[in-house]
């Protein structure tokens, strides 16, 4: 059985104004991941995601590249305990 957990990621580079959050939401929904993504004032994107461990690994791999017009310089990750979210939201 696959373990459920959450992760918080901070993504820096050209990640705002390139549909990063909307693309993350689309993929998260396909992978049945819940949580949220938001822009930060310093130009980074913060993502909080919860789901099955194997799906989170796939999602994290995508976060390290982002959508077509993005340029990801750094993507940090912190694993966190499971939290039950209903959907994936763009904040």
Curated annotation (Swiss-Prot):
It is an enzyme of class 3 (hydrolase). Gene3D superfamilies: 3.30.70.100. The keyword Hydrolase applies. The active site is at residues 21, 39. Residues 6-91 form the Acylphosphatase-like domain. Keywords: Hydrolase. It catalyses: an acyl phosphate + H2O = a carboxylate + phosphate + H(+). Disulfide bonds: none annotated. Its EC number is 3.6.1.7. InterPro entries: Acylphosphatase, Acylphosphatase-like_dom, Acylphosphatase-like_dom_sf, Acylphosphatase_CS. Pfam families: Acylphosphatase. GO terms for molecular function: acylphosphatase activity. Belongs to the acylphosphatase family. PANTHER family: ACYLPHOSPHATASE. This is Acylphosphatase. It comes from Legionella pneumophila (strain Paris). The gene is acyP.
